[in-house]
Amino acid sequence: MTLQAQDLSVDRGAKRILTQVSLTLEPGRMLGLLGANGAGKSTLLACLSGELEPVCGHIEINGKPLRSLASAKQARLRAVLPQKPSLSFDLGVREVVGMGAYPYAELSPADVDALCEKALRQAGVSHLAGRRYLELSGGEQQRVQFARVLMQCQAAPAGQPRYLMLDEPISNLDPRHQIDVLRTAHDLAREAGVGVLVIVHDVNLSARWCDRLLLLAQGSVVADGAPAEVLTPANLRRVYGVEADVLPHPREAGTLLVLMR
């Protein structure tokens, strides 16, 4: 059981945004999408989440064509945190997080409450539970939305392969909370068997927390593999136009440290 994309191509008007992109997201693994601005990362995530239809190629989730599944069924298999979640209603934080239970009508109120408290705790926002969402800072709202998708993933029946897609989930966060979010996503993959796809700009954080990396440039895959295979000086020069030294991390065995120069 996997989330698999094969030879995806996407056009916007007369411009091709993605060209024959393939990837596999496995339950229990964390895959990082890297690339310069405009490389096609968010477009690829939109295709994988069912939001955007590719002009060619196909996507399967747990062996079934994604396009054959109703949106309600898709919501039981994957949760998506967009780059800029929009919410203009004056809801309480618990109400926002509780939206993660919407695909699971069979849950009892007690189950929903327990899952909500767990997600608030995992996202480190239990102290915000009594606040109104619109009163929060941008970073606090981002972490509350992270709690929502955590709840959606964990509300699924035990043993069902499921996936979490995160589009720049740490963009508005300070360093401590960036690490907290990525650690939580990593733990969710390891402990709950969720397949996690995350778009991150920081190559060092991606090397630390992701099992695999997929590097995009101008809508095409440059490299796909373990961090040590992907984060090479040649690949970084091609994708970002910078020189870089790639060294063994001095404190994290088996992890790379990338120094841009």
UniProtKB/Swiss-Prot annotation:
Annotated organism of origin: Bordetella avium (strain 197N)
GO cellular component, one term: plasma membrane
Enzyme Commission designation: 7.6.2.-
Subunit annotation: The complex is composed of two ATP-binding proteins (HmuV), two transmembrane proteins (HmuU) and a solute-binding protein (HmuT).
Keyword list, A-Z: ATP-binding, Cell inner membrane, Cell membrane, Membrane, Nucleotide-binding, Translocase, Transport
Entry's family note: Belongs to the ABC transporter superfamily. Heme (hemin) importer (TC 3.A.1.14.5) family.
UniProt protein name: Hemin import ATP-binding protein HmuV
Domain ABC transporter: 3-243
An MF annotation (GO) of this entry: ATP binding
UniProt subcellular location: Cell inner membrane
Name of the coding gene: hmuV
Biological role stated in the UniProt entry: Part of the ABC transporter complex HmuTUV involved in hemin import. Responsible for energy coupling to the transport system.
Binding site for ATP: 35-42
Membrane association type: Peripheral membrane protein
Top-level EC class: translocase
